């Protein structure tokens, strides 16, 4: 199964991971945690903990959103680069944006998604990997 940004993408390939392996939501979660100086996804949801085996990344991100909100943070903006040769991201951008916005309690206008390729170079170009980079901007309410 291939999940990108919480959306199941039709593909003969999938990702490996302790959870559902969604590289987009994992990167979003890590970026938000980093922006709030609250650690990382591996600290919060260890792959040694069986209760997180095969868990949907939408659930993990939802738990982090609750934690940051409880600590007075709000997401201002998410800028997301999805780097993959296949599948092409363009036709899934709106679905992914809406899914992430709903989980994060923000407007879809606060999320920007870009699909990139490596022009067939490296493991991503050979369709053996997917990468995702995310910059998260947060606001602390005092």
Go through each PLM region and give its residues.
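RNase III-family endoribonuclease catalytic core
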Residues: 1-94
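Short, low-complexity, polar/charged sequence segments that are solvent-exposed and flexible
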Residues: 8, 21-23, 99-103, 130-134
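Structural signal for hydrophobic packing residues in well-ordered secondary-structure cores
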Residues: 32, 36, 65-72, 100, ...
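Short, conserved loop-to-beta-strand elements that form functional interface hotspots
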Residues: 79-88, 94-124
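C-terminal edge-of-domain segments
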Residues: 124-142
